[in-house]
Structures are given as structure tokens and as C-alpha cells.
Amino acid sequence: MKVLLGLRLARIAVHLLFGLASLTPQQFRVLTMVCEGLLNKQIAYELSVSEATIKAHVTAIFRKLGVRTRTQAALLLQQLESISQH
């Protein structure tokens, strides 16, 4: 059972790593800001871009990570960070 759980976690980590590796530097910045709880409008202001640009980045991030919500994206990033600490 522990082996299966370990394999499942490894598969999740690999999927996340590929998803994260496919993000552009700007998309990764947006992802970290999303995970900090910032709204699209706030992120746009901080990065000096339009809110529409941020919406496009968020859509691309969700597609690449295979998630549908900001909460799911934040949880995936937290899971990856906790796996990498072990």
C-alpha cells in the first residue's frame, strides 16, 4: 500500500513538474501571485499589464496545470513544495 501511495505521489509530482516547466517566466510570476491571493486587477497593476493579459495568463496556467480554479492551482503548488521538502 505504501509503495502504491509513493508511486501515486511520484506521478502527481512529475505531472506538476512538467506543467510548471511549461510555464513562461511571466506565467510563473502570475501563478505565485495568484497563490498569494491577489486578484487579477492587483496582479495587473503590480506587473504593469492589462487585466485582460492576466486573465489570458491565468487561463493558460490552468490549462497547463490541469486545474479549473485558483484554489486548485494554489493547492497544487503547495503540494509540490511539500513533496520537494521531503
Regions picked out by a protein language model, each given a short descriptive name:
Residues 1-4, 46:
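C-terminal output helix
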Residues 4-33, 86:
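Regulatory hinge/linker segments at domain boundaries
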Residues 12, 23-24, 54, 69, ...:
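Intrinsic low-complexity/disordered segments
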Residues 22, 48-50, 82-84:
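Generic serine detector
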Residues 31-32, 45, 75:
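A cross-family signal for key residues in well-ordered alpha-helices
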Residues 34-38, 77:
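Short helix-to-turn junction characteristic of helix-turn-helix DNA-binding domains
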Residues 37-72:
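Recognition helix of helix-turn-helix DNA-binding domains
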